[in-house]
Amino acid sequence: MPRTQKNDNFVDKSFTVMADIILKILPTNKKAKEAFVYYRDGMSAQAEGEYAEALEYYEEALTLEEDTNDRGYILYNMGLIYASNGDHDKALELYHQAIELNPRLPQALNNIAVIYHYKGEKAKEDGDHDGGEALFDQAADYWIRAIRMAPNNYIEAQNWLKTTGRMQIDVFF
């Protein structure tokens, strides 16, 4: 059963109705509309914590979606699910695929940096100081890229870059 038929949340239901109306009036092909329906249902399932269901919808959306930017967003959302479930390697793979298709996704760059930072912390805890620092350097590279795209975001990352000496003065110019 499509998620649109079993959603009891008024806001989600309203969004679904509006999205359906927009889909009907937009001059786009049937395949693109169907891809959006699966993507929308994936977002709805993800918001409800139904991650396995969300991944199924996203996988189906990927088979139908032709627009590279939209495919990037689908992969990004899939990465969010894997990251929240602790599968950081799979999340990294999906985030990298997302920015390959849609380089204007600072949120994916940020999430890559967060994972590298986390892995750096773990490496240091395990006694691998050099490995941890290398992972911190990777995190810094991705945060700098994200901040260049969205300079008013990622304030904590900006502070970390400054306090660790990983940000040059002209990084945003």
Curated annotation (Swiss-Prot):
Statement: the UniProt record of this protein carries the keyword Membrane: yes
Alphabetized Pfam families for the sequence: TPR_1 (PF00515)
Record family assignment: Belongs to the Ycf3 family.
PROSITE patterns (UniProt xref): TPR, TPR_REGION
Main location: membrane
Record keyword Transmembrane present: no
Gene name as annotated: ycf3
Subcellular location(s) of the protein: Cellular thylakoid membrane
Protein's membrane topology: Peripheral membrane protein
Organism: Trichormus variabilis (strain ATCC 29413 / PCC 7937) (Anabaena variabilis)
Any Gene Ontology biological process: photosynthesis
Protein name as catalogued: Photosystem I assembly protein Ycf3
One GO CC term on file: plasma membrane-derived thylakoid membrane
Entry function: Essential for the assembly of the photosystem I (PSI) complex. May act as a chaperone-like factor to guide the assembly of the PSI subunits.
InterPro entries, alphabetized: PSI_Ycf3_assembly, TPR-like_helical_dom_sf, TPR_rpt, Ycf3/AcsC/BcsC/TPR_MFPF
Sequence ranges of the TPR repeats: 35-68, 72-105, 120-153
Source species, domain of life: Bacteria
Keywords from the UniProt entry: Membrane, Photosynthesis, Repeat, Thylakoid, TPR repeat
